[in-house]
């Protein structure tokens, strides 16, 4: 997907870089596949901030995405390619032969009118979903299940993919976008291909107001706060006095936060980079 630059007619346009969304074919979503998305503003059940820097922004409707791809051996036709405000990748509306409509993540190169299908004996083509055990080594996949039948959890954002590196018994070794090598059960489903919108990482908002439209509020530096508000606060706003930490005193910027013992450790062949 190409990038769109702007002439610096205003300060907000100077440096702004957008995605050229010429491939989108619909402006409004399929109503039966959407539902309301309540605005949480970063608050938990107790009404207190649980996630900072969230609030405001444009009202959204959530699009129900088919991460499971459990309509096996039923062909479907791509009707539209649409924008989804809840994720970085575009989505595709698929009409299946049994009358059902579902949204799927749109991989790179997916076109309107293309046939997609899921199952154990389907063609190895982009947007088709198969068990990992029947996909050859070296293929790129996305929307990978970690638990059989749970639905895809890995490689779901714009431009991401996992590579099938090897097969060993009942497991398949995947090279994940983070660089981690992980074993996944051969019966877990994955979708062929790399996700589209690969230039999403190269976009620039251009002004703070566009971040506010997305529901992102300002981030205040800890050094600019008072000592009561942050471990790095005080000292005329200039001196740190210690290594970088979170507002709760946890080391950050490179500090490993993964727990020492997790059930999934035995499935990780090599750690993320």
Swiss-Prot record:
UniProt-listed Pfam families: Ribosomal_L2, Ribosomal_L2_C
Region feature Disordered, mapped onto this chain: 28-55, 222-273
Domain of life, per lineage: Bacteria
Biased composition (Basic residues): 255-273
This protein's record includes keyword Lipoprotein: no
Gene Ontology MF terms: rRNA binding; structural constituent of ribosome; transferase activity
Keywords: Ribonucleoprotein, Ribosomal protein, RNA-binding, rRNA-binding
GO BP terms in the entry: cytoplasmic translation
One Gene Ontology CC term in the entry: large ribosomal subunit
Keyword Signal listed: no
Matching InterPro entries: NA-bd_OB-fold (IPR012340), Rib_uL2_dom2 (IPR014722), Ribosomal_uL2 (IPR002171), Ribosomal_uL2_bac/org-type (IPR005880), Ribosomal_uL2_C (IPR022669), Ribosomal_uL2_dom3 (IPR014726), Ribosomal_uL2_RNA-bd_dom (IPR022666), Translation_prot_SH3-like_sf (IPR008991)
Cross-referenced NCBIfam families: rplB_bact
Assembly and interaction partners: Part of the 50S ribosomal subunit. Forms a bridge to the 30S subunit in the 70S ribosome.
Function recorded in the entry: One of the primary rRNA binding proteins. Required for association of the 30S and 50S subunits to form the 70S ribosome, for tRNA binding and peptide bond formation. It has been suggested to have peptidyltransferase activity; this is somewhat controversial. Makes several contacts with the 16S rRNA in the 70S ribosome.
Family according to the record: Belongs to the universal ribosomal protein uL2 family.
Protein name: Large ribosomal subunit protein uL2
Organism: Treponema pallidum (strain Nichols)
Gene: rplB
């Amino acid at each position: 997907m190409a990038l769109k630059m702007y002439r610096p007619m205003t300060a907000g346009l100077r440096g702004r870089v957008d995605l050229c969304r010429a491939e989108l074919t619909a402006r409004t979503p399929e109503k039966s596949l959407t539902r309301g998305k309540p605005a949480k503003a970063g608050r938990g059940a107790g009404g207190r901030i649980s996630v900072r820097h969230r609030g405001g922004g444009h009202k959204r409707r959530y699009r129900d995405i088919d991460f499971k791809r459990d309509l096996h051996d039923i062909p479907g036709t791509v009707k539209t390619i649409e924008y989804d405000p809840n994720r970085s990748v575009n989505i595709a509306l698929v009409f299946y032969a049994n009358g059902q409509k579902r949204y799927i993540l749109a991989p790179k190169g997916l076109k309107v009118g293309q046939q997609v299908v899921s199952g154990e004996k389907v063609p190895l083509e982009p947007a088709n979903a198969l068990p990992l055990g029947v996909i050859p080594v070296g293929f790129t996949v996305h929307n990978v299940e970690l638990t059989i039948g749970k639905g895809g959890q890995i490689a779901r954002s714009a431009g991401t993919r996992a590579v099938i590196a090897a097969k060993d018994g009942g497991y398949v070794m995947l090279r994940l976008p983070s660089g981690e090598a992980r074993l996944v059960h051969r019966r877990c489903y994955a979708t062929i291909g790399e996700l589209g919108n690969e230039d999403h990482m190269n976009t620039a908002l251009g002004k703070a107001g566009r971040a506010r439209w997305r529901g992102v509020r300002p981030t205040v530096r800890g050094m600019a706060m008072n000592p009561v508000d942050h471990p790095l606060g005080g000292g005329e706003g200039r001196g740190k006095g210690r290594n970088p930490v979170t507002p709760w005193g946890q080391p950050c910027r490179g500090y490993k936060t993964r727990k020492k013992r997790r059930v999934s450790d035995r499935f990780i062949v090599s750690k993320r980079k």
